Amino acid sequence: MHASEPSEDETLDSLIGDWKIFQLRRGHRFSTDDLVCAWRASMASPRGRRLLDMGSGIGSVGLATLHRMDPEASLVTIEAQEISISLARRSVAVNGLVDRISLHHGDLRDPGVLAEGAAFDVITGSPPYIPEGKGVMSPVPQRAGARMELRGSVYDYCAAARRWLAPGGRFTFVMAAQDPRTEDAPAANGLAVVERWDYVFSAGREPHIATLVTARVEDNPPPRRSGTLVVRGPDGRWTDDYLAFRREMGSPNPLKG
């Protein structure tokens, strides 16, 4: 098998625009969570040049964010799971992005994983939502690491973002909407929420996930804004707003609904 082609256990899928991504057939795969995180991050900092994606997994959030930035923008990623960073490395190569993306195999909780003095205009993260011991552990290690808090929680993501966020920069993350830690973690780490979007997966239900855009408190951030996106309407079909979001992102529309 050539490195640019998927094995029997992998797929090579469209992510955004003409960029593609390698994924395991039965592993962790990119989702709406990743796309909305990239969407709000790029909207918050459209002229960002130095991007960091923490806990980057297979690279979906970082790639989708970078795609929406100017060609001069560059991306650094941090990922602990070897299988995920290996897939991301191949995605970088197949998209011709080797000169724009630097992949780091390590733990985002370790300040030494990046060079001293590293600072970024745009930071993204998709923390796992489930505390260890509170849910059923996936038998697939890659999935387990993406869903369970095996290497820290949203508090660790916010602490790391605070460490590497440049003055005037923005940290955007996606998290469970109903979890009180979603709001508490930024505040506990000197970050102010400047925007929150909630995502209702089925009309009439509570929001399932939320994206928060944050800034350093000492940067005198602007007043907080909010928004809501409903994914499926009362009839179970994709809403016009959701399909418009997919078009704006340059991401293929869902196949069903």
Where are these regions (language model features)?
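Conserved SAM-binding motif I beta-strand of class I
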Residues: 74-79
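Conserved Class I SAM-dependent methyltransferase catalytic core
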Residues: 30, 151-208
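Conserved SAM-binding loop of SAM-dependent methyltransferases across substrates and taxa
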Residues: 58-72
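A short acidic, Gly/Pro-enriched loop at the edge of an enzyme's catalytic core
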Residues: 113-123
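Conserved class I S-adenosyl-L-methionine
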Residues: 48-55
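Conserved SAM-binding loop
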Residues: 88-89
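Mobile active-site "lid"/loop adjacent to the S-adenosyl-L-methionine
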Residues: 127-156
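SAM/dcSAM-binding transferase cores
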Residues: 206-257
